[in-house]
Amino acid sequence: MYSMMMETDLHSPGAQTNTNTGHTGPNSGSKVNQDRVKRPMNAFMVWSRGQRRKMAQENPKMHNSEISKRLGAEWKLMSEAEKRPFIDEAKRLRAMHMKEHPDYKYRPRRKTKTLLKKDKYSLAGGLLAGSGGGGGVGLGMGAAGVGQRLESPVGHGGSTAASYAHMNGWTNGAYSGQVAAAAAAAAMMQEAQLAYGQHPGSGAHHHHGHHHHPHNPQPMHRYEMTALQYSPLSNSQSYMSASPSGYGGISYTQHQNSSVASSGAIGALGSLVKSEPSVSPPVNAHSRAPCSGDLREMISMYLPTAEAGDPSVQSRLHAVPQHYQSSTTSVNGTVPLTHI
């Protein structure tokens, strides 16, 4: 293609008679669409015609763009006296072009809108990612609240809190302090209400959402595994769903979070628990059988003062230890989950 361009430039008497479509213009003086009127050559083009062919013969493997770069650099280094004959030739060609095409008007090609399209696609992708990742962000914030709440009951029982933290992957020194736990509880209650409003009673949706967003932090993964996921597999259903007959620390934490979050959420999770049989590994009695009074006290510690006196909240608090104690007898004699 480049050799054809060079040959047509060299063998044509005037630039306006070229049939090359490198520089397009309107069909003002030509009968055929291919014979378009080109702009008259400037001084550099007049000079570079012979130089381009000479350089191409000396370096046959050199690309035409590299030849143009070298010719441009060489043209800049030339003096005005050396450029004068080529400038005069360019003026003559321009005058000839104006005589042959008096109504010629240069209309440059419109710039392609590829950049605008790219910006539009990137903006749409960002919006999709933002809308899809909203649930993950909420779950991540909720996971931080779970981690802080897991470490808060150290004063009530060190072995119980240590077993909760060990089963969920947090170390004992990761989150400490009642103040941080209370603040996290308030934030997690809002996030849980938002999540339940978007996906009521659907734990499997959170499960698929987690796989579509692998960039979520690891604590969020643990929170989903213990609180929000639901799997139809019978051997892992109690661990992945919110079954109260699973791990002691997990079920206790889940009921605590559900009672604080919303009454509708615990109702939906309770329906999931009752509809599916569960198989869970045996857990030591001291790690999953806290006193019901201590349980209600620890749950009510995170409730606001306005909700503490609410009869619906009190009924949920009474229902939690009963539901928890009734499920402790169905755990013994089962196979532990060795694949987790």
Curated annotation (Swiss-Prot):
For this UniProt entry, what is the primary localization, expressed as one broad class? nucleus
Gene that produces this protein: sox1b
Bias (Polar residues) occurs at 14-32
Locate the motif 9aaTAD: 297-305
Organs and tissues of expression:
At the 3-somite stage, expressed in the forebrain. At the 12-somite stage, strongly expressed in the forebrain and weakly expressed throughout the central nervous system. At the 25-somite stage, also expressed in the lens.
Organism from which the protein derives = Danio rerio
GO molecular function ontology, one term from the record: DNA-binding transcription activator activity, RNA polymerase II-specific
Task: Extract the SUPFAM superfamilies matched here.
Answer: HMG-box
User: Pfam families of this UniProt entry?
Assistant: HMG_box, SOXp
What's this chain's function? Transcriptional activator.
Record protein name field: Transcription factor Sox-1b
- At the top level, the lineage of the source is Eukaryota
Q: Quote the record's domain comment.
A: The 9aaTAD motif is a transactivation domain present in a large number of yeast and animal transcription factors.
